Amino acid sequence: MPPLLQIDFPFTGPFGEEVHQTMQPLAESIIEEPGLIWKIWTESAATQEAGGVYLFSDATAAQNYLEMHSVRLTAGGVTGIRAKLFSVNNPLSLICKGPIQ
């Protein structure tokens, strides 16, 4: 089963189109990370949070990414990083049209 990584942290913006323009180079580098299948970017201007949900090919790749990304976020001044690693239940996810390969 592929692991799913959820990361979120306090974020004061920008949001929407402005964050798209600001973070596009980062997105283009993230897709090159070893073992990453996909990432869904998350943001909430109302609660001042951002993050993402990531699907990896294996737990080692997910753990390596979490460690690297936590260092990157911390170096950028981000505090309050929350992360959870889950196993994906493929059969049930497929029934519910989960984007599982």
Annotated model-derived regions:
Residues S70-V78:
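A common structural junction motif
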Residues G51-L55:
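A short, exposed loop/beta-hairpin motif centered on an aromatic-Gly-Thr core
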Residues M1-E49, T60-E67, K84-Q101:
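Short S/T/G/P-rich N-terminal loop/turn motif that feeds into the first structured element of a domain
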